[in-house]
Regions:
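NAD(P)-dependent short-chain dehydrogenase/reductase
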Residues: 4-63, 68-77, 107-110
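C-terminal substrate-binding subdomain of Rossmann-fold SDR/epimerase-dehydratase oxidoreductases
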Residues: 48-155
């Protein structure tokens, strides 16, 4: 897998790599249709179309949402870092460190909600521990999900 290759190239060729695991990226140009569309993109499209927001399962699954500009900043911080050699070849979580249920996210956008059957194998909880990336690269996310949603829907 890609993470093992990065670690191997760091060890064998002294190539400075870092491995980032991004948590539920969102932003202004996110997909709004298709299998890779995030829940925020789908909800905003449904709101714009006057449709009810569709929640899969009970809506209590929790997600750690990370703004795309915060993800870009994490990459920049790592690229310009003077971190110790021990930092390279390591895995870092890039997330907000806060998670929201899908129901909570939907409630930020609309009261018009419908539930559909759950998908098999869907993760119940994602939550990034961002201590390692903060301690190594002094990175923290800046964008608050609730503020971003309000801006998108004009509140």
């Amino acid at each position: 897998n890609g993470e093992k290759l990065c670690k191997m190239y760091t060890d064998l060729f002294d190539l400075d790599t870092v491995i980032f695991r991004y948590f539920n990226a969102y932003g202004e140009r996110q997909p709004i249709r298709g299998q890779y569309a995030p829940v925020l993109g789908i909800f905003l499209r449904q709101l714009a179309a006057g449709e009810p927001l569709t929640i899969v399962g009970d809506g209590e699954q929790r997600r750690d949402f990370t703004y795309v500009k915060d993800i870009v900043n994490a990459n920049i911080m790592a690229a310009i870092s003077n971190a110790d050699k021990d930092a390279y070849g390591q895995v870092y979580n890039v997330g907000s460190g806060v998670n929201y249920s899908v129901n909570e996210v939907a409630a930020m956008i609309s009261d018009d909600i419908k539930y559909i059957p759950p998908r098999l194998g869907e993760a119940r909880i994602s939550l990034a521990n961002v201590d390692k990336i903060y301690n190594t690269f002094a990175w923290r996310p800046l964008q608050n999900l609730e503020e971003w949603v309000k801006k998108q829907i004009g509140k």
